[in-house]
Amino acid sequence: MTFAATVLTLYPEMFPGPLGVSLAGRALREGAWAMDAVQIRDFAIDKHKTVDDTPAGGGAGMVLRVDVLAKAIDHAREAHPGCPVIAMTPRGKPLTQERVRQLADGPGVIVLCGRFEGFDERIFAGREVEEVSVGDIVLSGGECAALMLLDACIRLLPGVMGAASSGHEESFENGLLEYPHYTRPAEWEGRTIPEVLRSGDHAKIAAWRKSQSEIDTRLRRPDLWERHIGARVQSASGAQREVQDD
């Protein structure tokens, strides 16, 4: 099955952009995924191709019109039924690896890119649009965020990455940051590769990597660490209840 990536944007020339090279580009050429960049302006309702208007209540900037957005979304949904519609916006829920994996396991995704002051609020409930943020930052538009979302999905598609285990050992896949990596030379400016990684003892290497993941997560992302600990406690409690029920 080909993963269908549809982007609704005022700048379709930005796609596939960096997704046309490297692993994603090869996967695109091989048909693992397909790219359709749709010009929102094509769905304008006047001869001037107007897609925005002034904010109700006053204020700076312009807001993308709900009627234009709705027509663009309806067009994309008709072409790709079953694909969720995601709007890239700093007001959205933080994008997680778990959500990325859910999307990658599906038929595709329709990504709505904003510009100006953003979207008319009514589009989200009116067309069941999921709001997603890639970080606590504000970009000039949603296109760069859309590229991030699509790249995260594409690399998880079957056959895109070389090693089957690659996607499962990375940061966030098990709720932790990924362990540190090293390669030759063994010594550089007095800094050496940890001895355990040169030992050939796979059990010790696995234990070291797990320990480093936990240490780095605890120090660098205490929010992830607290979530990880909470999940472990919940899992242990559930297992204990099952034993007691038996």
Swiss-Prot record:
Protein name: tRNA (guanine-N(1)-)-methyltransferase
Its biological purpose: Specifically methylates guanosine-37 in various tRNAs.
Binding residue positions for S-adenosyl-L-methionine: G114
Family: Belongs to the RNA methyltransferase TrmD family.
Record keywords: Cytoplasm, Methyltransferase, S-adenosyl-L-methionine, Transferase, tRNA processing
Lineage top rank: taxon: Bacteria
InterPro entries, A to Z: Alpha/beta_knot_MTases, tRNA_m1G_MeTrfase_C_sf, tRNA_m1G_MeTrfase_TrmD, tRNA_m1G_MTases_N, tRNA_MeTrfase_TRMD/TRM10
GO cellular component: cytosol
Organism, scientific name: Novosphingobium aromaticivorans (strain ATCC 700278 / DSM 12444 / CCUG 56034 / CIP 105152 / NBRC 16084 / F199)
Pfam family membership, one: tRNA_m1G_MT
One of the protein's GO biological processes: tRNA N1-guanine methylation
Enzyme Commission no: 2.1.1.228
A single GO molecular function term of this UniProt record: tRNA (guanine(37)-N1)-methyltransferase activity
Gene this protein is translated from: trmD
Enzyme class label: transferase
Presence of the UniProt keyword Methyltransferase in the record: yes
Catalytic activity: guanosine(37) in tRNA + S-adenosyl-L-methionine = N(1)-methylguanosine(37) in tRNA + S-adenosyl-L-homocysteine + H(+)
